[in-house]
Structures are given as structure tokens and as C-alpha cells.
Amino acid sequence: QGSRISLTESGNLLLEHCERILEDYKRLEYEMHLLHNEYTGGLKLGASTTIAQYVLPPLLASFIGKFPQVSLSLLNGNSREIEAALQEHRIDLGFVEGVFRLPNIRYTTFLEDELVAVVRTGSKLAVGEEITPDELFHLPLVLRERGSGTLDVFERALQQHNIKLSSLQVLMYLGSTESIKLFLEHTDCLGIVSVRSITRELYSGQLRVVEI
């Protein structure tokens, strides 16, 4: 097709069967090792940004301590990028936030998390300890980017109150929770983040939670 190269229908069918054979071989190899209590090989993981930064590191360190012969790699991206990597067989297992989106992927709940609204301590933003959903219309926000599980969950929560994301005053969409926290240090706006990501900031008093 012009300057593009693409597989024919037969080629796609062959590729699909080759991928299945490869997966079956990897599974057989894994199960054969288990028969001899051997844990070797490679495990390619993928995780959305918040999970990769705040949840997995201690778990991966513990895993490596127990299974030193297993080679681990971790791909970091937003939830949709990780789902795409899983579909393309670039990773063996993915960890994502948010809602179950794709019917051809099997999702299993890993842990529960909570999104919270936060401002920097001492912010000039006129918010107390609690606001109503309708007050969000009048507050400047900084949010995660499109494709992130954090934004998906927040948008679904808004829909439960008949609020459209497009009707809010979003100053910035940023690609990581760390970026949001740094942004909040220098601006008077409200951020929506995972509560797991702000443990240190809450302890040090840099940020405070605003209940919605």
C-alpha cells in the first residue's frame, strides 16, 4: 500500500498462530522448571506510572530476593500504553489503574486505591477541608494526561454527578503524579492524585487533602 508494508490476511493468520505456539512453548518451559523447583528465565512486566513509582518497587525487590535466577524487566507507561504492550506481547503481565476496558484482556483486582484532591499547604485557593462536587466548576485543576487510569477513574466519578470534564477549569494535564506534585508546589490549584503517591507530602505537611 504505497510506501507502507503490511501483512496479508494469510500473513496475519500465520503470525497469530506463531504467537500462540511461542506462548505455549514458554508456558511448557515454565511448567517443566516448576517440576524441578527451578525458577529461572525472564519475566517482562509493565505498569502504569503510579503503580510503577509507588507500589511495585518494594514488591520487586522482595521478588528478586526470593528468586534471584529470574530476570525482571519493567516497562513504564500510562494504563492504555501498558494494555497495548500486553496485546502486542511486549510484556507478560501488566499492572494498570482504572476501569476494565478491553474484552480480550483478563483483569484481576490487585489492590484497592483511592483518588484524593490535594492542595499545597498555605495555598491561597479558597478551599476548606471539604468541598462539594459542584464547587469543582470554580476551581483550577491539574490532572493526569489522557490515557491514564487516574484520569479515567476521576472522569467516571464526575459522570456519577452529571459533571463533564470539559466543563471544568483544567490548567494542565501532566504525564506523571510527580509532575503534578511539583506543579502544586508553585501554584494555587487543586490536584487529583492517588493517596498512595502523597504519603511523604502529607507526613511533611507539604500537601493537604481536600475531601469531596
Task: Describe the predicted segments one by one.
Residues 8-11, 45, 85-87, 136, ...:
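Hydrophobic residues within well-ordered alpha-helices
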Residues 141-162, 195:
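Secondary-structure junction motif
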Residues 1-5, 12, 35, 42, ...:
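A short, glycine- and basic residue-enriched loop/turn
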Residues 70-77, 165-176:
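Short beta-strand-to-loop elements that line the ligand-binding cleft
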Residues 102-142, 146:
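Flexible hinge/capping segments at coil-to-helix
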Residues 103-109, 113, 175-212:
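Beta-alpha-beta core module
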Residues 36-103:
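Central regulatory/effector-binding core of bacterial HTH transcription factors
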Residues 6-37:
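Alpha-helical "hinge/linker" immediately C-terminal to small N-terminal DNA-binding modules
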